Regions:
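Low-complexity, acidic/Ser/Thr- and charged residue-rich accessory regions of DNA metabolism proteins
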Residues: 317-417
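An N-terminally biased module of ancient metal coordination in phosphate/nucleic-acid-related enzymes
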Residues: 1-83, 376-377, 389-391, 398, ...
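Short acidic/histidine-rich active-site segments
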Residues: 191-207
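Divalent metal-coordination and catalytic microenvironments
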Residues: 10, 44, 75, 91, ...
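Histidine-centered divalent metal-coordination motifs
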Residues: 10-14, 143, 201
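Cys/His-rich short segments
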Residues: 237-305
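Extended substrate/RNA-proximal surfaces in nucleic-acid metabolism proteins
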Residues: 4, 51-170
């Protein structure tokens, strides 16, 4: 049995559009360490300047992965690319040399590969998957259900997208608005390992690792990581951790401009045009999954690990203290004392006994407990607006749009304790 590695394999550097200028290796490593992540993707590794920065800042670890010397956080080269149908795919590579080689080959299909961290490629998903047959890498669709840039906004099945290169697909990244209960209602997806990743654009612990995968690896090497994702001996995925899907910003069908939410039939009747403001209505992940689902209920294959639903600690603290913003000084103070005392944000979120958290702050302990038990009330997100945690009273006023997700605790999920 190997050691556990909490891993976030999809994020972006400062060279992708709309990201924080603080997305540099030192800040990512510092944020990852505070969060409690052991392994993160570099993101954007086809970008030449970013690759040079990565080479400069990281050293090769004894098993061949990259390591940030100060924090000991491990990195693996990753990149997200956009194909000609605006579908996003995630690629995980063995080394910077492999990234260099892939950059050379994909340059022929891209005008912005040297300028944009998430390059656009003049090729289809099938052509990309086919080209990758000659490369050692892990490959799969990114945030598979989101309405703007995903495989299922464009196609009704993976086979439709990847065609005869279908066997090149190693995993499906679920995205923030979906979980394995959603995805396992589609039997085509049962054979794939699900990745839960943050797609972070800034290094703060409420972004980085807001979704992550817990791997068990015999050694922290690329080959063992690959074995874990392909479900071969040497490693395995033991846990997917992610946002409660209703908190994702594309969970419900909603107007992209004014955020008003619609039932699917209503949106169809309105021809996807918002009667309130004239904006475009975007199909929510939940409705898209319901369209694609061939199973009445999720049916998890034997290899599927448990899925733990959680949200960033700062958001729990802010809500527990009745503060409207997670950047409030008081939120940061409680966050710091919890993380200093118990090791990392992930430890506080899922491992530390509630009684010990109550010694720091009882209100936070109380709310965290209902999170772990899945009894918190949610106002679902949609149209680009994140969902929110709401009080019992607020939820009674809002029925039936909000609901209580129910989940078992981590100990129950993994049969521990
Ligand atoms: Zn993307
Ligand atoms: Zn609108």
């Amino acid at each position: 049995m190997g050691e556990q590695y909490d891993s976030d394999l999809h994020l972006h550097s400062q060279y992708s559009g709309g990201t924080s200028p603080r997305m540099v290796i030192r800040e990512i490593a510092r944020g990852a360490a505070k969060k409690g992540l052991d392994l993160v993707g570099t993101g954007d590794i086809l970008h030449p300047k970013w690759r040079r920065h990565v080479r400069r800042e990281l050293v090769e670890d004894e098993y061949g992965l990259l390591k940030e010397p100060k924090t000991g956080v491990l990195f693996v080269p990753t990149v997200e690319v956009e194909d000609e149908r605006r579908v996003h795919h995630l690629i995980i590579l063995p080394s910077l040399d492999h990234a260099e080689e892939l950059h050379g080959e994909l340059s022929r299909y891209s005008d912005d590969i040297d300028a944009e961290g998430r390059p656009h490629l003049r090729m289809t998903g099938a052509e990309l998957a086919d080209l990758l047959k000659d490369h050692d890498c892990l490959f799969g669709p990114a945030h598979a259900f989101v309405p703007w840039t995903s495989v299922f906004k464009e196609y009704d099945s993976l086979r439709e997208c990847y065609g005869s290169a279908m066997d090149r697909v190693d995993f499906v990244e679920l995205g923030l608005s979906a979980d394995s209960d959603y995805a396992d209602r589609i039997s085509e997806l049962h054979e794939y390992t699900f990745l839960t990743c943050s797609d972070a654009h800034s290094p703060y612990p409420h972004r980085l690792g807001r979704e992550f995968v817990r791997f068990e690896l015999e050694e922290p090497s690329y080959d063992v990581l690959k074995a874990a994702i392909r479900r071969k001996p040497g490693g395995r995925v033991v846990l997917n951790v992610g946002l409660i899907p209703e908190l994702g910003k594309y969970n419900r069908t909603a107007c992209a401009r004014c955020k008003r939410q619609f039932e699917l039939e209503e949106a169809e009747r309105l021809n996807w045009r918002c009667p309130e403001c004239g904006g475009t209505i975007k199909k929510g992940v939940r409705d898209r999954v319901l369209e694609l689902a061939d199973l009445e209920k999720p049916k998890h294959p034997n290899h599927r690990p448990p899925y733990l639903r959680i949200i960033p600690l700062a958001e729990i603290i802010a809500k527990a203290l009745g503060l409207s913003t997670i950047t409030a000084k008081k939120v940061r103070a409680v966050w710091n004392s919890l993380v200093r005392r118990f090791g990392s944000e992930i430890d506080v979120l899922i491992e530390t006994p509630i009684e010990e958290i109550a010694e720091v702050d009882e209100r936070v302990a109380e709310l965290l407990k209902s999170f772990r038990e899945g009894t918190v009330n949610i106002r679902p997100g949609g149209g680009g607006e994140y969902g929110k945690i709401i009080t019992e009273e607020e939820s009674e006023r809002e029925e039936p749009r909000s609901r209580k997700p129910v989940q078992r605790t981590l100990d129950e999920l993994i049969g521990r304790g």
